[in-house]
Amino acid sequence: MTAALTLAAEHDLAGRHDDAINALARATQAGDLDAMTELGKRLIIGDRGPLLPKDGAGFLIDAFKGGHAEAALKLATLTALGAHVEQSWHGALALLVFAAQRGSESARGQLRALAGTAAGTDVGAGEQQWLRLAQRIDLEYWTRAPAGETLSADPLVRVYRDFVTDSVCTWLIERARPNLKRALIYDPVGGKDIADHMRTNSAAGFDLMHADLVQVAVQCRMSAAVGLSVHQMEGPTVLHYAKGEEITNHYDFVNPRIPNYDAEIKDRGQRIITFLVYLNDDYEGGETDFPSLGLRYHGGKGQGLYFTNALANGEPDLRMVHAGLPPKDKEKWLMSQFIRNRIVLGARAEVQAS
């Protein structure tokens, strides 16, 4: 960690976030690529500082041009999404290769996951192995609409039997594992998130600067399936249920009758779709249960399932109460994605998992 990053961390620890931003800015002006990258990341999502995404993206671009691997890694995510930079999947993969060639283990792992190739499997050695891995990635797979099956027409519930690959499932699990925290629910009385007996599982959330290209690829496949933009998606969350853990009956829509939620709907829109990706299936129980529909679904590894949370007019659909039943013997993993009815990408984000 450079002196500027250490100083910024000390300021943040003391609650002096403006001083932290200023320390990073001074070091950036002096050409410190680590500080430049950190400043860019913070400005893009308004992390303990101003929300200046265009400026933040500019700092990442400058750091990348200086040869900084992490800057390239973050730019890869932005480029795949078309967030604050021009959208290009080929450009995103080129940035990932750049980071991998400069030693980024995260970039190397993402390339392996997307290519479906185990480490060291017939791609040779040296810097060119990462380019060869990138060339194996089937971009059409991630950007075309997969074949699906309707489980319920009204309200709509659809399943995709071949939604993501095993290597992507493994990556998503291992990426989330060290970042898991007790999952919370919103308490409308206290106006804050709290732990509650109705939800006993763990979760790891990823904002724009902590998401990676594998997660974005999954989001793009979701986008093709539902016909809505990735820019309408909140940050992805990976959920973990140990044996006996659950979330009881609940709704995913934003309830306009809860104080302050009507303002959120006006600002960010309604959560109209929930998309789940099942990352393992070696457990008993653990179904996704829709009691009002008489439907329970035990997802297979790599399968996707989405359901609507709102009526055509945007009002909450009370039929869509659902639960994550407890696994009876082993753990359960899945990726959860909320999709809104308006653009939310680029909004100020809370600091989430690293």
Regions found by a protein language model. Give the residues of each.
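TPR-adjacent "capping" and linker segments in tetratricopeptide-repeat scaffold/adaptor proteins
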Residues: 1-3
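Fe(II)/2-oxoglutarate oxygenase catalytic core
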Residues: 6-15, 20, 26, 41-42, ...
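Short helix-capping/linker turns of helical repeat alpha-solenoids
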Residues: 30-33, 45-47, 65-69, 81-83, ...
